[in-house]
Amino acid sequence: MKRISLVVVLLMSIQMVAQSKPKVRTITGFVRLGQNTYEKQIADALIVLRMAKSEFETAGYQVQTLRLTTQPLSELVVGMSNEQALAFLARLDQLSVKEGFLPNVGPAMIQDADDPATMHLLELVLSTLPDIQASTIIADEGGIHWKTIHRTSELVKYVAEHSPRSQGTFKFTATAMLKPLSPFFPGSYHTGPGRQFAIGFEGANVVADIFTKDRRNAEAATADLTAALTTHAKVADNIGNKVAQETGWSYAGVDPTPAPLGDVSIAAAIEDFTGAKFGSSGTLTAARIITAAVKAVPVKQIGYSGLMVPVMEDKLMAQRWAESTYNIDSLLAYSAVCGTGLDTIPLPGNVSIEQMDRIYGDVASLATKWNKPLSARLQPIPNKKPGDQTDFQDPYLFNTTIHPLP
């Protein structure tokens, strides 16, 4: 009987460990494609990414996506007319489906002085091609890019009105103070020669395990979460360095941000800790704990390295948004202590370009004030007003209620 009990305990312990293991959200490669050599370059890059994927699977991790980020859009299509560029990008989009990777063409505007014509091309890309993702940079160490902000608002308005079910806006974000080589889309970008890769986790379940155990104990939760995240980040670091050594590619680092998705909910984890609904008092404290733990992970970090709170990608978060337990101002407040920003925010269809300018400006102002990477993925929905329900038909978006703008 004792032997049977011991076996049961061991099996339960193994199961608990397995449940606590995060998924690898992305292994992202960074490439500088030639217009005549891109197919061979992508094939070579996928060999590297698939090697890393195999290493993770051998270690017991599920890898969700392989991704490729190209040089910035204007450099990718240099010398092409809009028609030629669209045809080229359509081939890239089709190749991504065939080969099983997600494509990102980087920022259409990096500086305010950049030619805004690239933004017009991106409007067409996001409105007509199903998979390519992209971004703009609205703030960096040099300050806030006000012209880029305004052109970004115009782009988002256009894509919302011209893409099927307005879902093209899901593939675009504006970043502020985010450095190159982030593995997470849509804000990922690079400006170098390529042949690099980075890793990002989906680890909200790890946070949930710790916050359930250390409920309302901030010190214990910070220490235990740091230790748990470190365990998995070191696996990524070891795999990254091994693959780099074997392939000649450079390993850029890991983003330990515990990204949520669907039922793997960061909102649920935070509620486990606070004992109250997401958005209640204590939510900001929980956000600070998560960010402190992430920042303390002793590996080569890249990207946001903080906390993601995507309103419509997290099932419980979408529900709490519908209940109005938090809003845009709440998310901006949380962004003061973590890398939140405004992610997958549904907006009424009649939102003006000037209103979006102000929202992007707030995110850029907060990012530059505190020197932290933030992003804003705004999703206006034509013919929808405050109080209406969104009706996206996307497996990664959970429909919710549209808030009035303040």
Task: Place the predicted regions along the sequence by residue.
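Anaerobic metallocofactor- and corrinoid-dependent redox/one-carbon enzyme cores
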Residues: Q19-P406
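Sec/Tat signal peptide C-region and signal peptidase I cleavage site
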Residues: I14-A18
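Sec-dependent N-terminal signal peptides
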Residues: I4-S13
